[in-house]
From Swiss-Prot:
The modification Phosphothreonine is found at T144. Residues 169-172 are annotated as: Interaction with CSK. The lineage of its organism: Eukaryota, Metazoa, Chordata, Craniata, Vertebrata. The modification Phosphoserine is found at S80, S83, S102, S182. The gene is SIT1. Glycans are attached at N26. This is Signaling threshold-regulating transmembrane adapter 1. It is found in: Cell membrane. It comes from Homo sapiens (Human). Phosphorylated on tyrosines by LCK, FYN or ZAP70 upon TCR activation; which leads to the recruitment of PTPN11, GRB2 and CSK. Negatively regulates TCR (T-cell antigen receptor)-mediated signaling in T-cells. Involved in positive selection of T-cells. The modification Phosphotyrosine is found at Y90, Y127, Y148, Y169, Y188. Homodimer; disulfide-linked. When phosphorylated, interacts with PTPN11/SHP2, GRB2 and CSK. Its main location: membrane. Specifically expressed in T- and B-cells. Present in plasma cells but not in germinal center B-cells (at protein level). Expressed in T- and B-cell lymphoma. Residues 1-24 form the signal peptide.
Amino acid sequence: MNQADPRLRAVCLWTLTSAAMSRGDNCTDLLALGIPSITQAWGLWVLLGAVTLLFLISLAAHLSQWTRGRSRSHPGQGRSGESVEEVPLYGNLHYLQTGRLSQDPEPDQQDPTLGGPARAAEEVMCYTSLQLRPPQGRIPGPGTPVKYSEVVLDSEPKSQASGPEPELYASVCAQTRRARASFPDQAYANSQPAAS
């Protein structure tokens, strides 16, 4: 018992010589090696308790929000109780943002980077309806292939004949028009004239 652990001796020596130990406390006030008791460092223990409490409250809030989100978007159910297969998906960004198919967005929902209503009137909206295959006695998995059905072109006459092509999502018609404009005398855009 005469031989004490050198690390414990160093900790006790440091603790005794520190300013916190000038009150006459001894090494028995340590909970473990290097961890002060509540009476020595009550401020640190209060801070640790507050941080732990905030962490637990945050964890509970996130878990409740996550479970609420999962119950709303139950797999196989749409917004109004319909199955996912009955709700068509559109590749048009404006439709995804507003839920409406109108050409002119409301003034409070306009994106200032798009150029306002003048550009919105010039754009050609081209979107596609993606329909999933109906389940045959089972819930479709994440690897179920998507059947591409129809492509609908909703266009208005443009004031400018040659302008930049609008940004379209899921658009086949715009690529076809570009290919015809680039190679009017060739059957395909990527075909090259034969070398003679």
